[in-house]
C-alpha cells in the first residue's frame, strides 16, 4: 500500500507540512519531543519551522548519514500524523467519526496536512479491517491529487476498493442463498 512517506516512496514536503501546522499542534509535538528526549527530531522540527535548510546542512549539523536523515524524516512524519489524528489507536466509533469529518479535514486544512491526516486514517482503517470506509478516504485522496501524478495511483486504489466491496457483497449473497437452499433441503426430508 502506502509507506509513511507516501505512495511509491515519494518524499512528502515535510517543511511545508511543519510550517502549516497550527501553534497548538506544533507546541504539542515540541513538548512530546522534549519529554522523550528526541533531540534530533526536535532539531528537525524546529529547523523546518524556522528556516529552509538543505539536507546536506542537516546531515552535517546532526552528524548523521543520508539514510539516517531519511529515517528521521519518516519518523517525524509519522509523529505528525499521529498528532494530527489525535490518537494512535482509535476505536471503530472514533474512526467512523473521523471518516464523517473527511470533508471538514479537506476544506479546513492545507492539502499537505489533509493528505497526512487521510493517509493516517487509511492506515487505521486498514488495521481495523474497515474496508467500506476506505472508499471515502480514497475518494478524498483522489480529489486532493486531481492535478498531480498521484491521481492515477489513488484512482487505482479507489477502483480496487470498489471491486473488493462488490466481491464481498456478492460472496455474502451467495452464502445466504446457499444457507437458504440447505435449510430448504433439510426441512424437506
Predicted features along the sequence, with ranges:
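Flexible inter-repeat linkers and adjacent short helices
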Residues: 1-188
Amino acid at each position: 500500500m502506502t509507506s509513511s512517506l507516501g505512495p511509491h516512496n515519494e518524499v512528502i514536503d515535510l517543511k511545508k507540512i511543519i510550517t502549516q501546522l497550527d501553534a497548538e499542534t506544533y507546541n504539542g509535538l515540541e513538548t512530546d519531543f522534549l519529554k522523550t528526549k528526541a533531540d534530533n527530531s526536535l532539531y528537525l522540527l524546529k529547523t523546518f519551522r524556522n528556516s529552509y535548510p538543505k539536507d546536506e546542512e542537516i546531515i552535517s549539523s546532526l552528524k548523521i548519514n543520508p539514510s539516517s536523515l531519511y529515517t528521521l524524516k519518516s519518523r517525524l512524519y509519522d509523529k505528525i500524523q499521529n498528532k494530527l489524528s489525535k490518537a494512535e489507536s482509535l476505536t471503530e466509533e472514533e474512526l467512523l467519526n473521523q471518516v464523517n469529518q473527511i470533508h471538514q479535514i479537506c476544506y479546513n486544512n492545507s492539502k499537505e496536512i489533509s493528505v497526512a491526516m487521510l493517509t493516517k486514517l487509511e492506515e487505521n482503517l486498514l488495521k481495523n479491517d474497515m474496508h467500506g470506509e476506505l472508499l471515502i478516504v480514497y475518494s478524498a485522496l483522489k480529489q486532493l491529487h486531481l492535478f498531480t501524478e498521484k491521481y492515477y495511483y489513488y484512482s487505482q486504489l479507489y477502483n480496487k476498493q470498489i471491486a473488493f466491496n462488490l466481491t464481498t457483497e456478492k460472496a455474502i449473497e451467495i452464502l445466504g442463498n446457499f444457507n437458504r437452499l440447505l435449510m430448504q433441503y433439510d426441512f424437506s426430508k
